[in-house]
Design a protein with these regions (language model features):
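Solvent-exposed interaction patches of small proteins and small membrane subunits
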Residues: 1-112
Length: 112
C-alpha cells in the first residue's frame, strides 16, 4: 500500500473511533460518565485505538499536522494500556469534550 493510501486508511479509522466516542458520550454529563464503568471502558478503548493508529502514520503526515499533540495522544495510549488503574476519568471527560473535537476537525481537514 502506498503511503498516501495508508495514511488515508488510518485517518478514516481514527475518525471511526471518534464517531464511536461521540456516540457513547452524546447527551451525557461528566458526573454521569465518570461513574459509568461501561462508558469508561468503551471510551478508553477508543482512545487507546486512536493512540495506536497514530503510531502508524508516516512521519510526513504527522509533520503536516503540528497542531495535533501526537506525543500526548501516544502517551495516553501507553498509560491506558499499561497503567489503567491510574487514569483520571475527569481528565478523560475533558479529553472527550475538548480535545477530540479539534482532532476530528484536523483529520477531516486532511481529507478535503
Amino acid at each position: 500500500m502506498e503511503h498516501k493510501e495508508r495514511n488515508e486508511s488510518i485517518r478514516l479509522k481514527m475518525l471511526d473511533e471518534i464517531a464511536d466516542i461521540e456516540a457513547f458520550s452524546k447527551g451525557r454529563e461528566a458526573a454521569e460518565l465518570t461513574a459509568d464503568k461501561m462508558w469508561q471502558k468503551a471510551i478508553v478503548m477508543s482512545l487507546i485505538n486512536i493512540g495506536e493508529l497514530s503510531k502508524a502514520f508516516t512521519e510526513d503526515y504527522i509533520a503536516a499536522m503540528p497542531e495535533i499533540p501526537w506525543k500526548a495522544i501516544r502517551g495516553f495510549r501507553n498509560i491506558a494500556a499499561h497503567q489503567y488503574g491510574i487514569i483520571d476519568f475527569d481528565d478523560v471527560y475533558k479529553t472527550v469534550t475538548e480535545d477530540i473535537p479539534s482532532l476530528k476537525a484536523a483529520l477531516q481537514a486532511q481529507g478535503e
